[in-house]
Amino acid sequence: MMKRLIVLLLNCLIVMLLDCGIAHAQLKQVAKIDTAAKAVYVDNLDNIYLLSAREELLKYDAKGKLKWRYSNSRFGKLHSVDVSDPLRVVLFYADFQQVVVLNNNLNEITSYSFAKNGNLLVSAVASGNNSSLWIFDRASNALIKLSSSFTEDVRSANLFQIFDEVVDANKMAASDQYVFLQRKHEGVLQFDRFGGYVRELPIDSLSDFNITSNVIAYLNGSDLIKYHPTTFERSKQQLPVSLPISQAAVGNKIIAVLTEKAVFLLSDN
């Protein structure tokens, strides 16, 4: 535990030294979606996805026009939505241990029940490269990479060996190089593409985050923070939305800001 604390403090010091605080070009509102939603997501093509109170997934274009919708009452409440691959949207229903994969029109491509394997207890899912999936198995306290046919390709070490406790996963996200695991009420753990533990990032108290071009973006009050896990640089950008912000999602050129009754689409282009 002492070694972990020292590493985390060193990471924090590096961030303080390299924190550039770069002021980006001023963001402007380019569209508004007058729909109440529980969550918002943006892919790298700047498509916007809203999760409604009825567990319906709505897909909009960058101008805020509704294009497609998807709902599924068979598996209960959606635990997570991963739109990092616009052609392969991954939905995870934790209560039923079920994953559903959609195409860009939000039609089902495939689905899989983790309950088929009695040894698994999946608490988080992320989309990987080459149609793979990363999952966190609470039963073995490990990250597992599954192939497109849902067979095991990679398995990390038991994280109990590192943290002396069972890791309580809240969310996972994957980039080309890394996998990030957010612990409930704690920070974000970084792993390499083989499931090897890299470090605990010096950012905590996150309600949500997303990955864009290997950069972690998260909300801090009315500011959008972008953290570069390879250079330790961090930048801050104020979101020009007067209403209380519950979530922000970053795409290629679009930032979607979720408020109680609407979603504001911002851009600096």
Regions found by a protein language model. Name each.
Residues T35-D43, F75-V83, N119-A126, D164-A173, ...:
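Repeated scaffold domains used in trafficking and secretory/extracellular systems
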